[in-house]
């Protein structure tokens, strides 16, 4: 690809240059690449990148396949087509119906796609005990299967935050296991602040995507959490620009859809590229948004 604008999120600048891709991987990125240096010239295809901007692969920091109403394969294809190359996935709804076997089903189908999935083991099934029907309660034994047999990366959102704060035995056992194994533990704690937030974080939770005000986002950020800005098909109440202006540039600020983007919107507007466009429209600098 010749003469493309290349978004460099490490140095926070747009550079003009060439990109050489071989066998589906970036072989070289430079201000100028001489075609004479390239082996197998007979296979070389040159694309004029003038007027185009090359971005790094986008990552959805937290999402759910099931909310899209698509199969794992179709979901992954939609993401790849829109520049999302990796996603942190919580198979909560599949586990809600079929237990850990539901998660395995989603994982197996996605293996045949180009998306890089980061699967997290769902700890809070049911999410609201006593108010919903499901396959049964997820216990430590289920989480161990998902992590140790299925190869999941961490513990998905601890969405029953009341049980976390109350240190309810079965959920505490799961979170303690995650801490002992050094696993990432995602959060889900709308409106949880002050001493309750301290207890929630001490349980091992390291992220949150459910804040409803900038002040809530800032408190979680200042207490060391990864704060995930959510964008998609929903109208979100907290301003991304105001939060970023107050928090500053940080690797502890992420962007996700949380699965809250319809298949129709993905087809018409995109996926993480749509989420990026939304926060840029709010006033966030494009390079900061991409990072």
Q: Language-model segments: which ranges?
A:
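Divalent metal-coordination and catalytic microenvironments
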Residues: 4, 24, 51, 62, ...
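N-terminal metal-binding scaffold of metallo-dependent hydrolase/deaminase domains
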Residues: 1-40
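Hydrophobic faces of well-ordered beta-strands that scaffold small-molecule active sites
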Residues: 57-65, 87-89, 117-121, 154-157, ...
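His/Asp/Glu-enriched, well-ordered alpha-helical/loop segment
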Residues: 244-291
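Glycine-enriched alpha-helix->loop->beta-strand junction motifs that scaffold or abut catalytic
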Residues: 84-85, 151-152, 199-207, 221-228, ...
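Active-site mouth loops of central-metabolism enzymes
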Residues: 59-71, 127-140, 206, 210
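Divalent-metal coordination cores built from histidine and acidic residues
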Residues: 76-184
């Amino acid at each position: 690809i010749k003469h493309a604008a290349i978004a460099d999120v490490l140095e926070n600048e747009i550079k003009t240059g060439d990109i050489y891709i071989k066998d589906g991987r970036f072989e070289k990125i430079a201000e100028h690449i001489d075609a004479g240096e390239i082996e197998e010239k007979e296979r070389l295809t040159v694309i004029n990148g003038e007027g185009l901007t090359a971005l790094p692969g986008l990552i959805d920091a937290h999402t759910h396949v099931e909310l899209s109403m698509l199969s794992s394969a179709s979901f992954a294809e939609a993401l790849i087509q829109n520049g999302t190359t990796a996603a942190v996935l919580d198979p909560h709804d599949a586990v809600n119906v079929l237990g850990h076997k539901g998660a395995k089903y989603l994982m197996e189908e996605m293996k045949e796609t180009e998306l890089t999935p980061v699967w997290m083991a769902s700890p809070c099934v049911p999410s609201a005990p006593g108010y919903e029907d499901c396959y049964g309660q997820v216990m430590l034994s289920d989480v161990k299967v998902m992590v140790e047999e299925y190869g999941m990366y961490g513990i998905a959102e601890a969405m029953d935050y009341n049980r976390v704060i109350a240190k309810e035995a079965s959920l505490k056992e799961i979170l303690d296991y995650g801490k002992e194994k050094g696993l990432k533990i995602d959060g889900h704690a709308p409106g949880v602040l002050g001493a309750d937030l301290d207890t929630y974080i001490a349980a091992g939770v390291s992220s949150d995507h459910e804040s409803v005000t900038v002040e809530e986002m800032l408190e979680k950020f200042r207490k060391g959490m990864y704060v995930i800005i959510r964008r998609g098909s929903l109208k979100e109440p907290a301003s991304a620009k105001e939060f970023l202006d107050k928090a500053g540039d940080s690797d502890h600020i992420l962007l996700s859809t949380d699965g809250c983007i319809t298949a129709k919107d993905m087809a018409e507007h995109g996926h993480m590229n749509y989420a990026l466009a939304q926060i840029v429209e709010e006033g966030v600098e494009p390079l900061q948004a991409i990072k």
